[in-house]
Every structure is written in C-alpha cells, then in structure tokens.
C-alpha cells in the first residue's frame, strides 16, 4: 500500500465528512422570529460516520479493486444485441412477452402499479436513447417533452372531453412538434452548449406551466384525468357522465378495482412493445445508420453526403414523440398532473437510465429502468437522498464500467489466422 493512496483516502474521507456534516449534520429551527442553527439527530451523524468510513476504505482499496474487476469488464460481459434477428432471440423475446402478460395476474395490485411506472420510464429511456445513445446529442431537458405530452392529454380532456386513445397520438404529435422546433436553434451546438440549451428548454416548459394558472391550473395542476377504456368500456364501478358502459356490467362479472390497474399495465406494455418495434425498424433503415454516423463523426457524416441538420431534426422529433406518449400514460396513471412532476430530477433520472444501462442498447435501457425504478420504490424512506444516491451510483459506474452495464455491440468481421497471414505476405 503506497503512502499516496493512504493520503488520498484520508483527503477524500475528510472532504466527505465536511460536506455531509454541513448538509446533513445541521438543521435550522425557528426560535421566535429568527432561525437558529442546531445539530441534527444522532441517527444522521451515525450515517455520516458510516459514509466517511465507506469513502475512506473505497479510496484506499480502489487500486486493488480495479485490478480485481478488470476481467469482469471484458468482452465476455458484453451481451449480443437482442433484436429478434435469430430464431433463439425470437423465442426468448416471445417467452419474455408471455411472462410480462401473465405476470400482473399473479402479483399484488401495488406490484402491478410499480410495473406500470417502470414501463413509463422504459418508454422515456427508449426515446432519450434515440437522441443521446444513437445520435450522440446530450439532452438534459427531456422532462420538458414529457410534460408537454402529459399536459396535452390533461388539457384536451379538461376543456374538450377527449379520451385517452384520442389524446395519445395527439400528445405524441404535439411533443414531436416541440422537438422539431427546438431542433432549429440547436443545430450548430454540440456537447455542453447543447446540454445547456435543452436544460433551459425543460425549465422554461415547467415555469410556463407553473405560472399560467388560468389554463394549466398553475401549481394546483389538473385533476380528474380519466383512465384508458376498452372500446368505450370503463374499468370503474359506474360510468362517467356521457360514458357508454362499464367493463363489469357489460360482461356480467363482479367489479374488481384491480382490473383498472391491470388494464393500464397492459396498455403500457403494448406501448413498450410498439416502441421497441419502431426503434428497431428505424435502426435497420438508412436513418438509423445516419444517426450512428452523426454520433461517431459529424465531419465524416458531411463528407458522405448526409445532412447533419436533417439527422438532428429527425432525432429530436422522434425522441420527443416517445416522451409525449409516456407523458400521456403518466397522466392516465396518476389521474393528476402538476409542474412539480416534471422537474430536472426527472430528466436526470431518465438520463441515468440510458447512461447506466449502456447508450445505444434497447435491452440495456429496459434492464436499467427496471433496476432503478424498483430500487427507488424500495428506498422510499431515503427519498430526500435519492439524488445523492443516484449521483454516487453514476460516479461508481463511470469509474468501474463507463460504457454501461450492457453496451451496444457493433457488427464486426474478423479474418481467420490463415487469411490474415496471407494478406500480410
């Protein structure tokens, strides 16, 4: 163990202790008309000391840890692309689909509701993966398109009485139009500049929704958003005003509140399957190759006769459309939307799904969405530290496996040893 490693471990632990002591170790209390700084509860200091010890030993043992896991991040840990191109992959995908359809009938109502939220984040992750993972454009304000889709459904239902299935394509079109309009001012921007512009866009959308109280309801939001129906049959005890009939009354079965949750899950699953189908078809088209060319080298992309302007516009437009679909599903699940549901934390969470899973890989996005959403639901007691945990997880991933859990594999051709020697000769 080198003295430099010990010194770095002590320095990192000291920095963590100071920062955690400031943010977690003190609290403000109201004493009459003034605020008084007081020490926090003992349980917080216990966690601070535990975190300090973890940081110290992690920094101390990191060189040995990196050597030990070097073989884990090798090629054998990279799974092949799962796109249904082979018979085995088709059978595997069919088995997953059957399990996903049968699963809500075997678990509790709460588990199905969490799975529905997971499906929403899968759609968001797949959409953001188009512009970040495939096109190489860093977007930090994806929550703005998400909010546009949700509020499109809420406003059309509130003012015009339109249902879920009518608003679903309209919300996608409105969000796609917003992505198309945003694409024009960012055509010449790259990297950090593009990220700042998109971050500003997401905040502008949220603030407009927050301040426009006459139309959007401001901070109070919009409530009483209906759930999707099955050919006009509502999954409720009684029909809404102007409704046709209920599912239980039409089929003569006993009313079960779980039917509404299960049907919403199946709708979300259908949208996920359609999203995967559309994206995989696009990747096999020249447009998908153009996205990858733009990500690898924009100058080379121009030299091949491709227009980066059109490629960026299509990426922004298609990505925003998926966010609109997810926003509609989110509004239907919640039955209520407000600007506080679309903060920067949502955009960061979706970006973490894409980065941690592996940029460019659809299967990796699904895996990361399941892991992160389920983990967040299980750690509801630590909700105030969710962004801290998410940031720490991303730091660890960038150190251990910067390419993501399951990075996208690219087609490769390898010459046999005999052919290689013949070419060298």
Swiss-Prot record:
Subcellular location field: Cell inner membrane
Annotated GO MF terms: branched-chain amino acid transmembrane transporter activity
Protein known as: High-affinity branched-chain amino acid transport system permease protein LivM
Signal peptide per UniProt: none
Domain of life: Bacteria
InterPro entries: ABC_transp_permease, LivHM_N, LivM-like
Its job: Part of the binding-protein-dependent transport system for branched-chain amino acids. Probably responsible for the translocation of the substrates across the membrane.
Annotated source species: Salmonella typhimurium (strain LT2 / SGSC1412 / ATCC 700720)
Keywords: Amino-acid transport, Cell inner membrane, Cell membrane, Membrane, Transmembrane, Transmembrane helix, Transport
UniProt main location, coarse: membrane
GO BP of this protein: amino acid transport; branched-chain amino acid transport
CC annotations in GO: plasma membrane
Family: Belongs to the binding-protein-dependent transport system permease family. LivHM subfamily.
Membrane topology: Multi-pass membrane protein
Annotated transmembrane regions: 6-26, 45-65, 92-112, 120-140, 145-165, 167-187, 191-211, 260-280, 311-331, 353-373, 388-408
CDD domains: TM_PBP1_LivM_like
């Amino acid at each position: 163990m080198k003295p430099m490693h010990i010194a770095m471990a002590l320095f990192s632990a000291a920095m963590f202790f100071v920062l955690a002591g400031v943010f977690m170790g003190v609290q403000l209390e109201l004493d009459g008309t003034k605020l008084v700084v007081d020490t926090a509860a003992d349980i917080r200091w216990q966690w601070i000391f535990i975190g300090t010890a973890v940081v110290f030993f992690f920094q101390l043992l990191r060189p040995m840890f990196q050597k030990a896991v070097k073989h884990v991040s090798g090629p054998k840990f990279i799974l092949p692309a799962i796109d249904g191109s082979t018979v085995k992959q088709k059978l595997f995908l069919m088995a997953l689909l059957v399990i996903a359809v049968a699963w809500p009938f075997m678990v509790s109502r709460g588990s199905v509701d969490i799975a529905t939220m997971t499906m929403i984040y899968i759609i968001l992750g797949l959409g953001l993966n188009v512009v970040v993972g495939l096109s190489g454009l860093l977007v930090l304000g994806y929550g703005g398109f998400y909010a546009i889709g949700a509020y499109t459904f809420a406003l059309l239902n509130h003012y015009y009485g339109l249902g879920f299935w009518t608003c679903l394509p309209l919300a996608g079109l409105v969000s796609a139009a917003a992505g198309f309009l945003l694409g024009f001012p960012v055509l010449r921007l790259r990297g950090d500049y593009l990220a700042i512009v998109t971050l500003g866009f997401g905040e502008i959308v949220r603030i407009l929704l927050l301040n426009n109280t006459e139309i959007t309801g401001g901070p109070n939001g919009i409530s009483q958003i209906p759930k999707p129906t099955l050919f006009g049959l509502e999954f409720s005890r009684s029909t809404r005003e102007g409704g046709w009939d209920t599912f239980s009354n039409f089929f003569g079965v006993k009313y079960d509140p779980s039917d509404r949750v299960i049907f919403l899950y199946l709708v979300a699953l259908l949208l996920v399957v359609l999203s995967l189908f559309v994206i995989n078809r696009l990747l096999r088209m020249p447009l998908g190759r153009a996205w990858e060319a733009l990500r690898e080298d924009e100058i080379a992309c121009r030299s091949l006769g491709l227009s980066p302007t059109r490629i960026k516009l299509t990426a922004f437009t298609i990505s925003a459309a998926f966010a609109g679909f997810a926003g509609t599903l989110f509004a239907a699940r919640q039955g209520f939307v407000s600007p506080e549901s679309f903060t920067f934390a949502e955009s960061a969470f979706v970006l973490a799904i894409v980065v941690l899973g592996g940029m460019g890989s659809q299967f990796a996005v699904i895996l990361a969405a399941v892991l992160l959403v389920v983990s967040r639901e299980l750690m509801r007691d630590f909700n105030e530290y969710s962004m801290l945990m998410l940031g720490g997880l991303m730091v660890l991933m960038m150190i251990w496996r910067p390419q993501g859990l399951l990075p996208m594999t690219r087609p490769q051709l390898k010459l046999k040893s005999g052919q290689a020697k013949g070419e060298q000769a």
